[in-house]
């Protein structure tokens, strides 16, 4: 974590959280749509 001097930690956490929620949402949506097995 030496290269995070110019990037705020809260920004990294926010982007990471949004990405995780998006991936999780797509996975759940895919499971309900029946295409979750293709992932």
From Swiss-Prot:
The keyword Chloroplast applies. It is a single-pass membrane protein. The chain crosses the membrane at residues 9-29. InterPro entries: PSII_PsbJ (IPR002682), PSII_PsbJ_sf (IPR037267). It is found in: Plastid, Chloroplast thylakoid membrane. The keyword Plastid applies. Pfam families: PsbJ. One of its GO terms (cellular component) is chloroplast thylakoid membrane. Keywords: Chloroplast, Membrane, Photosynthesis, Photosystem II, Plastid, Reaction center, Thylakoid, Transmembrane, Transmembrane helix. SUPFAM superfamilies: Photosystem II reaction center protein J, PsbJ (SSF161021). Belongs to the PsbJ family. PANTHER family: PHOTOSYSTEM II REACTION CENTER PROTEIN J. NCBIfam families: PRK02565.1. PSII is composed of 1 copy each of membrane proteins PsbA, PsbB, PsbC, PsbD, PsbE, PsbF, PsbH, PsbI, PsbJ, PsbK, PsbL, PsbM, PsbT, PsbX, PsbY, PsbZ, Psb30/Ycf12, at least 3 peripheral proteins of the oxygen-evolving complex and a large number of cofactors. It forms dimeric complexes. HAMAP family: PSII_PsbJ (MF_01305). This is Photosystem II reaction center protein J. The lineage of its organism: Eukaryota, Rhodophyta, Bangiophyceae, Bangiales, Bangiaceae.
């Amino acid at each position: 974590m030496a290269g995070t001097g110019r990037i705020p930690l809260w920004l990294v956490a926010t982007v990471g959280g949004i990405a995780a929620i998006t991936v999780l949402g797509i996975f759940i949506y895919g499971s309900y749509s029946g295409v979750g097995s293709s992932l």
